[in-house]
Curated annotation (Swiss-Prot):
Cofactor: [2Fe-2S] cluster; Mg(2+)
Protein name stated in the entry: Dihydroxy-acid dehydratase
Assembly mode: Homodimer.
Cofactor annotation comment: Binds 1 [2Fe-2S] cluster per subunit. This cluster acts as a Lewis acid cofactor.
Functional pathway: Amino-acid biosynthesis; L-isoleucine biosynthesis; L-isoleucine from 2-oxobutanoate: step 3/4; Amino-acid biosynthesis; L-valine biosynthesis; L-valine from pyruvate: step 3/4
Active site positions: 468
């Protein structure tokens, strides 16, 4: 065991002395020492209850014969960080989380690891650490928030963002907005739709790194506590059998994750995080693979913001195992992949009985014949760009319109709110990429403003930044290379005609080849003048097309 490095032999007497200072005894030092990485926080609604989840994990570890120790990581609430300079730190925090978990585990020689995340960047950050460390590990997340209710209508955080635009459009009053904001988020948990946090929690389950139910059991249900206890017990089995993340997170497991990603219509951020996790596992998850799988896998669950259902609705009809079972009927899932249950995917989903086809449509009758995400390429995005096609209006799947170019989110939001954007326009936001932002901010505020004004099916938006999972509309992000790295998005000018063809997977600016080359040769990219962590991040971060990992 790794912990024997700090517990065994006379030379380790000083180490044992410090462990005794924790209240541990001789018997506890003979057992596997399990690190519990908790991202409990009083500023993140999705993490407010993780102290209770971590304690339940601790109980499970004890009951199975292990010695649990809890340690902490940081986290950022993307919703609170949205729309201001704080969002520059969100994606960048993913790397800090991965590094911090690695640091604590290696420094203290744990035998196994239970990861307790919940929200957007914490889940992938912890999975990156698990892949990097490659010791027995299991994830148990905090679970989704329940949907709110206002005047008999279910709602969630994305409704609040869009309501801001509705106030500006005169559709609702500020008093109504206040009522909506107080009703949308009724308690702890990750925001209730198929946004980034829930997307990643569901895909963690698909990858095999979490027990069935991890993605959909609501945060406030007692079943979530039982899942945490069970996860604590299961890590001891994984340690005893030496089942490691490298045994579970194989290329085929990632293909399963992308398959379910497409079926659910998950956040575009999955196209950043899955490649980043795979990178830590020594695997290359190219963007083209997302398109290859999307062409084969239909979109069978329409959850908010694309549809009307919430994660709790998916939970009630069997959750992720039921989705995988439905997909397996058409041989779209690799069933022989090992999971943290100790069983294969096939064994896990064999327990699924009746599937409610109101929430989970049959593969033969999907919402869309192709998956939820699409990767677009062209002269604007030779390295690729990503759109949640499941949340794009039919009228915007093919669009041609004049560019309205803005350097940074704030300029674009001001123009949208002040009525300077017309039907048919293509809003282009530059210098928001991983390096140019830096930090690749989410553009939820401008897309929500467009939706609130009733323009989400009339105006497109493209950017080298990214989008919240709560975004809907013709929002194309992750344009690579980014402007700060000399990408062609940086040469687009006001009035240029932008051609978007999502079915054809293309994104282009309609200018002559000679004009294109002239602009590129005269292009001098701007780099951010920033110090501190973001300054270091900007120097080392890779392209969005490779997961925005640090090089």
């Amino acid at each position: 065991m790794g912990s024997e490095t700090i517990t065994q032999g006379f030379k380790r007497a000083p180490h044992r002395s410090l462990l005794y200072a924790l209240g541990l005894d001789e018997k506890e030092l003979e057992k596997p020492i399990i690190g519990i990485a908790s991202s409990y926080s009083e500023i993140i609604p999705g993490h407010k209850h993780l102290d209770k989840i971590a304690e339940a994990v601790k109980y499970g570890v004890y009951s199975a014969g292990g010695t649990p120790v809890i340690f902490s990581t940081i986290g950022v609430c993307d919703g609170i960080a949205m729309g201001h300079s704080g969002m520059k730190y969100s994606l960048a925090s993913r790397e800090i989380i991965a590094d911090s978990v690695e640091t604590v585990v290696r420094a203290h020689q744990f035998d196994g690891l239970v990861l307790v995340p919940n929200c957007d960047k914490i889940v992938p950050g912890m999975l990156m650490a698990a892949a990097r460390l490659d010791i027995p590990a299991i994830v148990v997340s905090g679970g989704p928030m329940l949907a709110g209710d206002y005047q008999g209508k279910s709602l969630d955080l994305h409704n609040v963002f869009e309501a801001v635009g509705e106030v500006k459009a005169g559709k609702i009053t500020e008093g109504e907005l206040e009522n909506i904001e107080k009703a949308a988020c009724p308690g702890c948990g990750s925001c209730a739709g198929m946004f980034t946090a829930n997307s990643m929690n569901c895909l963690t389950e698909v990858l095999g790194m979490a027990l069935p139910g991890n993605g959909t059991i609501p945060a406030v249900y007692a079943e979530r506590i039982r899942l945490a206890k069970k996860s604590g017990r299961q890590i001891i089995n994984l340690v005893e059998k030496n089942i490691k993340p490298s045994d579970i997170m194989t290329r085929e497991a990632f293909k399963n994750a992308i398959c379910v990603d497409m079926a659910l219509g998950c956040s575009t951020n999955t196209a950043l995080h899955l490649p980043a996790i795979a990178h830590e596992a020594g695997l290359d998850l190219e963007l083209d693979l997302f398109n290859d799988i999307s062409r084969k896998v239909p979109h069978i669950c329409s959850l908010t913001p694309a549809g009307i259902y919430h994660i709790e609705d998916l939970y009630r009809v069997g959750g992720i195992p039921a989705v995988m079972k439905e997909l397996s009927e058409k041989d779209l899932i690799q069933l022989d992949q090992l999971t943290v249950t100790g069983d294969t995917v096939g064994t896990n989903i064999s327990r699924v009985g009746y599937i409610d086809h109101k929430i989970i449509r049959p593969v033969s009758n999907p919402y869309h014949n192709q998956g939820g995400l699409a990767v677009l390429k062209g002269n604007i995005a030779p390295g690729g760009s990503v759109v949640k096609q499941a949340a794009v209006a039919d009228s915007m799947m093919v669009h041609r319109g004049p560019a309205r170019v803005f350097k940074g989110e704030e300029e674009a939001v001001d123009a949208i709110i002040n009525g300077q954007i017309s039907e048919g326009d293509v809003v282009v936001i530059t210098y928001e990429g991983p390096r140019g932002g830096p930090g690749m901010r989410e553009m939820l505020t401008p897309t929500s403003a467009l939706a609130g004004l009733g323009l989400d099916d009339k105006v497109a938006l493209i950017t080298d930044g990214r989008f919240s999972g709560a975004t809907r509309g013709a929002a194309i992000g992750h344009v690579s290379p980014e402007a700060a790295s000399g990408g062609p998005i940086g040469i687009i000018q006001d009035g240029d005609i932008i051609e978007i063809d999502i079915p054809a997977k293309s994104l282009n600016v309609d200018i002559s080849e000679e004009e294109f080359e002239k602009r590129m040769s005269n292009f001098n990219p701007e780099l951010p003048d920033i110090s501190g962590y973001l300054g270091r991040y900007a120097k080392h971060v890779s392209s969005a097309s490779t997961g925005a990992v640090l090089e």
